Amino acid sequence: RESASENEITKHYLLENSEKYGVKQSQNLYPVMNEKNILNEKIRISRELEKLKKIKQKELTKKQQNTYMILMDYLKRQKNLSMYPYYERILGKTSGQQVQILLTLSEYRLKNEKDIKSYFRLLQGLDGYFNSLIQYSKEQVKRNLFISDQSLRGVLQQIQSVIKRNKNNILVATFNLRMAEIKGINASQKKRYCRKNKKLVRTKVIPAYEKLYSHLQALKGNGQNKNGLYYYKNGKEYYKALVA
């Protein structure tokens, strides 16, 4: 329940009718990547591990024991990774957060007007999410953990391609298709929603990408390591935790 309520994106992905499970409205639209949240996540993982350790395995069924072992293994991995909070590669030409969020939004479940309004809030809040990516990247620069210029060029090229395709953005095309499949909303209202989506992409999404591009371009020259995660300070230990 705690994981599902962390942000709107996660809640919507995990639960279709979150109210039935007692999950309240999320305060955050997106995952927040800042020092406070990183610390809170460390604390949460430690607490979950302590709770799990108190469970008597002998009293569990075979199926429950399997679930227990999987969860224990997962939490231990996450605890190890939490020791390296600024090593994560959040930016990438094909797998970075700036790419993944477009795919997530383009596949956002739309079954009713509540879902549509939630989706619109996410478009309006994209700039805030990108601000957290910018701040995270600046923290990586301070710690000499920022991506190389070669990798950054790929990221900037991808962002530029999104900006250039502002009129035929993936969020416009996929939204129109999903709207056509929704039942219980009349045709005129669907058209209004499609127009609003197009406007939000133009006035909120594209400017958010333009701002991200500008800030990341300013960080060019700060990536000291061209040889991968292993070659950062403590990179060997981080890589072991990552692939364990």
Task: Tell me what each language-model feature is.
Residues 1-244:
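N-terminal maturation segment of proteins
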